[in-house]
Each structure stands twice: as C-alpha cells, then as structure tokens.
Amino acid sequence: MLDVVPERTRAAADQLWATLTPEQKQTVEAVAVDMWEPFIRTIEKPVPEADIVHDKFHISKYLGEAVDQVRRQEHKELMAQGDETLTGTRQLWLYNPENFGPEQSKEFSAVKDLELKVARAWAAKELFSKFWNYQGEGWARRFFKDWFGWVSRSRLKPAIAVAQRLKRHLANLLTYLKHHITNAVTEGLNSKIQSLKAAARGFRNFRNYRIRILFFCGKLNLYPL
C-alpha cells in the first residue's frame, strides 16, 4: 500500500500517480485494473509504455452478474407459470461447484442439466475461465472468437452484453497472458481495510483513516535504527 485517496475518481487516481517519481514510473511494466474507463485513461499519461491488464477476477464478476440477471428473469417467467424450479438456487449459480458440499453438489447437478437459460449463461461463464490458461496469444484469440460466437447466438442479452464488452477490451485481456497479474492483493487489502474501519467504529476524518491504513498495510520498517 503506497497511498490512499478519499474518492474513486480520475482526479483521485491522477493524484496517486503524482506521488511516484519519474524513476518509479519508468519501472512500471503493467497495471492491473478493472474496465472502468477513467482508470484506464489515467494510466495512459504517466506510464504510456505500460500494458493495461484487465483483472480476471473482475471479468469473472461481470460474467457472474450476467448469470444472475438471466436467472432472475427466468425465475420470474417460471414463477408466472407456477414453476418453482429456480427457487432458492441463486447461490448455486454464483459459487464455485468445487466448494460445494455433498447436498449442494447433488442439488446443483440436478438443476444445471435442465434445459434452462441460466444453465447456458453459467456454462458460458465457466467456459471463459479457460481463456486465462492459454500460453500463446494466437490460441487465446481463436478461443475468444469461438466463445464470443457461441454467446452471441445464445439469445441471452445479459451474457451477450458482457461478451461485447470483453470484445471491445480484448487487447487488454490478452496482456494477462504476458504478465499474469491480478488485483488479488488489492482485494485482500480492501478486506483488511474494512476490518480496520470496523474495529475503530468509523473515523472522524479521512486523515486519521489514511494514517491507520498506511500504518497497518504499508509494510513500514518499524525496526529501530
């Protein structure tokens, strides 16, 4: 943790970049970031040679949100017909099946094999995870083309919208194959920061909040000289 700013804006991100020296900026080879346009724009000026890498965990989140949108719409349609097939299944579609217990595995196996729209959306999400395993850009591009074509023909609007978004940013997905960086560390720090905030029952001002975050998350050298 190098520094903290109070807002999630481009100006705030520019402020963070300004804390780095020219020498430090020259060492930046790649930046992991989500697809929020202001964040992308703020990277281009201070480190124009750095690759932008869209965080794969955010991509999974976008795809998961599409699955949930499909589920909610289909559940509404089924309930109108008196069909409760999808009642109580929300978490099954969002969690990793590898982490299911025996009962959850049995329940999910039964529902995912039905002819459901949400099952197709879920399959699209799971299939895309293979993208990150490719070693070469050419094979990854071929995979994406096939995956995009399949989703485009699925008639699942939320999934199609995410697929189109990923296609627009494909260049910054492919950079992951070169750098293999994510925001996993940042997400871990966010959890720690929320714990600090909860333990303090809030902070009177941002200055105190920032000091506490940097003290506990900044890897300070506290050994005496």
Regions of interest found by a model, annotated:
Residues I59-A80:
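Short alpha-helix plus adjacent loop in nuclease-associated cores
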Residues M1-L2, L20-E23:
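A generic short-segment signal for beta-strand/edge and adjacent turn/coil regions
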Residues D14, E23-E49, F57-S60, M79-L225:
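Acidic/histidine-rich catalytic cores and adjacent linkers
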Residues M1-A11:
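Glycine-rich phosphate-binding "P-loop"
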Residues V5, K56-F57:
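Residues at the C-termini of beta-strands that transition into short coil/loop
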Residues A11-T19:
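Glycine-rich, anion-gripping cofactor-binding loops and their flanking helix/strand elements
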